[in-house]
Regions:
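Outer-membrane beta-barrel biogenesis signature
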Residues: 29-52, 137-153, 312-320
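Repeated loop/turn-to-beta-strand initiation elements of outer-membrane beta-barrel proteins
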Residues: 49, 61-62, 92-95, 138-139, ...
Length: 320
């Protein structure tokens, strides 16, 4: 029963960072910066494991490089993803390692040389791996110690890596993979205020060159894409919690070979997240977001439903 109570206390705090990585290839990096994840730096006992499965839908406009004769493009994608995360300790500090995989299926329509076109795509997107470490806040704790620990301010850092593992055909203009590496360093702060957590993150995506861009021999380069996030989340006595989310991103100009650079992206998004415990070890998360303003850049509406299961490592048996 003590373990079950500890898990109940973890559920409103910890979360698996699930990624709809399939979108990254479609929007040239904009979807990466549009993601919003409240409580990404929450603490958890040493040896806590999380697995999550999610389904979702994303629909919105896609921005292409000016060298490509494609305009007024809209994508409607259904997504399925699975993720695993595990807490760890380093020099007495708490951290979290996670990995996520996504599959996408949907339709993309737009005008090619001013002629309406519609295509379908299905396959794996680029995977993602993330490692975070809390530099300020609670140190490593056992489940029993965690259950008694007060809430504290947390400051942490993380690195997300996206390798080119998704479906990619250089002779296709639209792909689910990106055929390049992406790296996102981030700093985060989480402050408890009464029943609330106030979170703020700052990050930037950096990209390698896609040297097999359409029609297969072009080189596509993209400048760093900066992003800031803010979240305000409240925990109820039932351990359910609700979050109000916001993000802004900017930058990410891209060029193909020596062609004209794309416009600098700039967009703001708002969203909401609800997490509901259904048993001591399981919870359901519902999230949605929409673009509030987008001077330039891809603009999406997203909806997500995720299931999460939590468990602890089995403690070593006592020696007789």
């Amino acid at each position: 029963m003590k373990v079950e109570r500890t898990v109940r206390r973890i559920l409103p705090r910890a979360t698996v960072v699930l990624v709809a990585a399939s979108l990254a290839g479609l929007v040239a990096g904009a979807a990466m910066a549009q993601e919003m994840e409240p409580r990404a730096y929450s603490s958890a006992p040493l040896g806590t494991n999380f697995v999550a499965v999610a389904v979702g839908n994303t629909r919105g406009e896609i921005l292409f490089d000016p060298s490509v004769p494609v305009t007024d493009v809209v994508a409607d994608l259904n997504l399925a993803s699975v993720g695993y995360a595990r807490s760890y300790g380093l020099a007495g500090r708490q951290g979290l390692m996670s990995v996520g995989f996504a599959y996408a299926r949907g339709d993309i329509e737009g005008e090619v040389f001013e002629e309406a076109q519609r295509i379908g795509r299905s396959g794996l997107g680029d995977m993602r791996a993330r490692v975070s470490l809390n530099l300020l806040g609670p140190g490593t704790m056992t489940p029993a110690e965690f259950a008694k620990a007060p809430r504290r301010t947390i400051a942490g850092v993380s690195l997300t890596v996206q390798p080119p593992t998704g479906q990619y055909d250089p002779e296709r203009l639209i792909n689910l993979g990106t055929n390049r590496w992406g790296f996102k360093p981030e700093v985060g702060l989480s402050v408890p205020v009464g029943g609330w957590f106030l979170d703020a993150y700052a990050s930037a995506w950096f990209f390698t060159v896609n040297d097999e861009f359409y029609p297969g021999e072009a080189a596509r380069r993209q400048d760093p894409l900066a992003s800031v996030q803010g979240h305000a989340s409240y925990t109820f006595k039932s351990r359910a919690w609700v979050a109000f989310d916001a993000t802004w991103y900017g930058g990410g100009e891209s060029t193909v070979d020596d062609g004209e650079p794309s416009a600098r992206q700039s967009s703001t998004r708002f969203g909401g997240t609800v997490s509901i415990p259904i048993t001591a070890r399981q919870s359901i998360k519902i999230a949605a977001s929409t673009g509030a303003s987008a001077r330039t850049g891809s603009d999406f509406n997203t909806a997500l439903l995720a299931w999460q299961f939590t468990w602890f490592d089995r403690p070593p048996a006592r020696q007789p």
